[in-house]
Amino acid sequence: DALNRQRLLDAQTFIRDELAQEGIPFAEIEQRLVPVPGDENEVDVFINVTEGQRVTVAQVQFSGNESGGDDDLRGAMGIKREGFWWFRGGSFNEIDYDSDLESNIPALYRSQGFLDAEVVSDTVVVDPTTGKARLEITLQEGQQYRLNSFSVSGNSEFEEEEFSSLFTSGEGGVLSSLGLGGGESTNVEGNIFDVEAFNGAISQALEWYRNEGYLYAEINPVITRLESEDGSSPMVDAAWEVQEGPLALINRVSIVGNDFTHEWVIRNQLTVIPGDVYSQDRLIRSYQSVSSLGFFETPMPFPDIEPTESGDVDITFEVAE
């Protein structure tokens, strides 16, 4: 093949990533191009890898975490300290560590009302003799926000009272930590605003819409900050802006790949019928029923949903015998 230096760099990146997954994040990789004797247009490629010490996490230290202890933060991380038992190896994985810094730790803080929390610096200190590492993470929490109000706009299929079942404390809704729908929501101090739960409940609300045929529904979360004027905790007004979109009907249901099984055997398992309003729940149950026949390779690919020009959908079930 023609020499491609980008492919050589990609090979080094692949090797480095694979070693990092095994707890060897600081490998040295050297590349050499050696001319082939007697052929000036060819070279042999040699990649020399010096793995270095396998790194395990011995300590994880935090600073700047004024609102809570280290244990909660460690529990939110994918990186774990080495333990006494064999299944707590504590290997250092750079990809997981980056995910902890950029996602897992900030998500924990956002669930506790700290909307601006961030990791401002980190250091990995490795003992070159033992390979044991100490992770030093510095945090800036920012202010803790509480909930002032919640509202929904653009909704006609579901009333705002119906949405409240998602976050009424007494009903164990997805947003129960917000305290909405009950007396606690009118508390002067407000409830701590769990933005992770607030955003997560959107998936449940969209599932409602998809089960009623609103396949194209969208919900835009809006968080408006209300700064404190008297030294009390700052608050937020939280809202969902709903765009329900058109109602989608099922135009056509096709089955492909059934070379031996009669089509009616499969269609008897389907609860999605042409002319019906689209329902995500019925589509999933149909998929599960066909899979459970035992005639086809598993896992089956999920049915393909193809929108038509009119906004309706064609559904295709693909099976392999």
Tell me the role of every PLM-derived stretch.
Residues 1-321:
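Periplasmic polypeptide-binding modules associated with outer-membrane biogenesis and secretion
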